[in-house]
Amino acid sequence: MEVALLSFSSSLSPLCHQRISTLTPKTSNSPNYPRLPVIRSAVSRNKKEETVEAVKSHLENCHLLAAINYKGLTVKQFQDLRRTLPDTTKLIVAKNTLVFKAIEGTKWEALKPCMKGMNAWLFVQTDEIPSAIKPYRSFQKERKLENNDFAGAVFEGKFYAPDNFKVLETMPTRAEVYAKMLGALQSPAINLVTTLQAPAREVIMVLMAYIKKLEDESNA
């Protein structure tokens, strides 16, 4: 935001000079350029609000939100990292307090244990979690950034600590889930019972795939 400073001609009357001096705060360091704390605080507040709204926007189609310890990373390393990530992920740096303000009261609030230290935030906007995480793991290994590990993540409302990341990194792909459950539906009844004990989301996914398969066969 630019602030215009107006100058006045010496031909102004003493009364005008008196009025101007009453409106201009005097400072010992810069008598001609008064400080503008109100404007600065307003700009700072606007930037914070923009950050909170940006986080909320990234969360709209988000499947996983992870915190990465970026302390010690150079600007170039951070830029290189961003270039390695797929289009389905977003990586930003934001203060913990602002991120928490955006996630407070939502399922993402489970990420609260990560609200300390210096974090970059990875928004995964696809349900193919392993393929979204892998680029960072590869970058971390290549650059020997052992200290810049995941601090934690939230997936489907559940918090995953660094020790539990193996679960996220080895999740089956959508195609693998379809193949496994379609095979179970076509197998003896005992396997079907086992299939129906799977999480509801997976059951719905496979049933939809099975219906599509039947439709394709009938249209053939």
From Swiss-Prot:
Transit peptide segment: 1-41
Signal peptide (from-to): none
UniProt cross-references to Gene3D superfamilies, sorted A to Z: 3.30.70.1730, 6.10.250.290
Molecular function terms from GO: rRNA binding
Pfam families hit by this protein: Ribosomal_L10
Organism domain of life: Eukaryota
UniProt entry keywords in alphabetical sequence: Chloroplast, Plastid, Ribonucleoprotein, Ribosomal protein, RNA-binding, rRNA-binding, Transit peptide
Cellular localization per UniProt: Plastid, Chloroplast
GO cellular component, one term: cytosolic ribosome
UniProt record similarity statement: Belongs to the universal ribosomal protein uL10 family.
Function: This protein binds directly to 23S ribosomal RNA.
NCBIfam families for this protein: PRK00099.1-1
UniProt-listed PANTHER family: 39S RIBOSOMAL PROTEIN L10, MITOCHONDRIAL
Quaternary structure and interacting proteins, as annotated: Part of the 50S ribosomal subunit.
Listed name of the protein: Large ribosomal subunit protein uL10c
